[in-house]
Every structure is written in C-alpha cells, then in structure tokens.
Amino acid sequence: MRIIAGSRKGARIFAPKGLEVRPTGDRVREAVFNLIGPVDGADVLDLFAGSGALGLEALSRGAASAVFVDSDRVAAETVLRNLDKLGLEGARVYREDAGRRLASDAAAGRRYDLVLVDPPYRMLPKFLPMLATRLPSVLAPESLAVVESEAKDEPVLPLPVRTSRKYGSTRVTLFEAP
C-alpha cells in the first residue's frame, strides 16, 4: 500500500497483520478522495482506522489534523508507525471503541470536517445504529462522512446521501452534514 497523492505521494505504508483488518486499497482510496475533493485545512476523523491509510492520505493531501481510532492494539501501533515513517504531524491515535470516541468528542464539542468510517464489513450492521445516533453530533456544518461497506450493502444514516458508488466488492457512500 502507498500514499496516492499530496506531500507524501508514493510513500509505502505498513498494514497490520490479522484477519479483521482489510485496508482500503489504493484504487478505492483514490476514488474516495476524488469524490471528496480538496481536504486542505480539514479536521479529519478516521474511525476503525486499521493501517490509517485513509487518514494518512488526508494528511498527505493537506488536512490540518487527523484523529485515528481503532480498538485493536496492533492497528493503533501500525498507525503510529506509519505516522512516524511519513513524518506527518497534527495527528492523534486512540486505541478505543469508536462509539466511545464519538461520545467523548461530542461531549467536548469537537467537530470534524471529514469523517472516514471503514469498519470490518461483517460488523457494519452492528455499528450502524451507534453511528446513526452519534456521528451527526461530531460533524461540522457542511462536512462529509464517508462510509465503506460491501458493494451489496447500502448503509443508512440520518444524513443526506451525496453519492454512493461501487468499486468492485466495495461500496463508498458519502453522507453530507446539514
């Protein structure tokens, strides 16, 4: 895996080993950022971060900050290794449950311009109710939430859908904050 564009274009990144981790491939990541558009100065939240590929891509493309969240120890350590390798600043890594992080950020009044959600596909149905109740409270006005899922699934959140596209076995759905 590599960074697609920006200040760290072409840099290879580490991926955590394990059955639960399915890093977003280069092709899908490039498509995601083509759909999103410029992220200069954005505050980004990368939920279920895994390798951190999505948030790292955002930082490389000019995001002001990124918060990486993954409950898995190896995944969180991998994100830290990638940040160190790439020399990217403006990042925090939390090894905790995504729902807990959303609740903490909402209580603290923290808002994000871009939220990237890429849970293990088989777990998405379990996480959707939590996302539906907690995600809107951390979205800044006119921000975006990107949810990756299996191509056959269509995630539903209480937010307007900007677009939903299939890329092989992956569906990418962009939700807009009101």
Indicate residue ranges for each PLM-predicted region.
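Class I S-adenosyl-L-methionine-dependent methyltransferase catalytic core
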Residues: 1-178
